[in-house]
């Protein structure tokens, strides 16, 4: 193995090579993961170059995206996907929409202009902070965002407190939705579910 100092030198050389080879990269961040899995929520993020976030734009909206926040990797296709989701939601401006697994609130904020109110729920607290910032920088005042494990957040009590959704938009992680979440969605009886 390498010493910590040697490892540091190699890391800097690699990052500098990436930065020099791809000058179009405006922000370059890295994480050191010595675990046997690829989760990063419990790891520190280091900025090598640029800012600790990027911005994406669609339909005049700006979205701040941090390193621990989920965002579709293909921005152009993300935009097409969000337009289709919005169309499937059939919004008229009067609906209460729940955006489950909202990430940085991109879909929630994207559909907010066609809804009465949008509530976004996400597991990653940093992503929810980005979602709130995204609503603020876009002048959106009809979104609410909550951080926590979906099965603990989306309960019958939550729905009783915040209202029965007319539409649920859900983009769960690969593992899918916990059965408790599915049960609460069935309890909520939304007119439409966009999955």
Pin down the residues of each PLM region.
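Single conserved hydrophobic/aromatic residue that forms the stacking wall/gate
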Residues: 1-6, 10
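Rossmann-like S-adenosyl-L-methionine
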Residues: 12-195
């Amino acid at each position: 193995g390498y010493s910590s100092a040697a490892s540091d030198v190699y890391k800097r050389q690699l990052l500098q090579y990436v930065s020099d080879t791809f000058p179009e990269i405006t922000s370059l961040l890295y994480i050191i993961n010595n675990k046997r899995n690829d989760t990063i929520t419990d790891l520190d993020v280091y900025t090598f170059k640029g800012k600790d976030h990027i911005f994406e734009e669609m339909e005049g909206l700006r979205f701040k995206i941090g390193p621990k926040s989920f965002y579709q990797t293909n921005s152009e296709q993300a935009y097409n996907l969000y337009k289709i989701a919005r169309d499937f939601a059939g919004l008229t401006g009067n609906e209460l929409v729940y955006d489950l697994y909202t990430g940085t609130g991109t879909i929630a904020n994207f559909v907010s202009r066609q809804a009465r109110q949008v509530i976004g729920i996400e597991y990653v607290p940093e992503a929810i902070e980005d979602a709130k910032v995204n609503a603020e920088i876009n002048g959106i005042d009809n979104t609410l965002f909550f951080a926590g494990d979906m099965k603990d957040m989306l309960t019958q009590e939550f729905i009783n407190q915040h209202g029965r959704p007319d539409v649920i938009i859900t983009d769960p992680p690969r593992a899918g939705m916990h059965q408790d979440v599915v049960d609460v969605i069935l309890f909520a009886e939304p007119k439409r579910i966009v999955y």
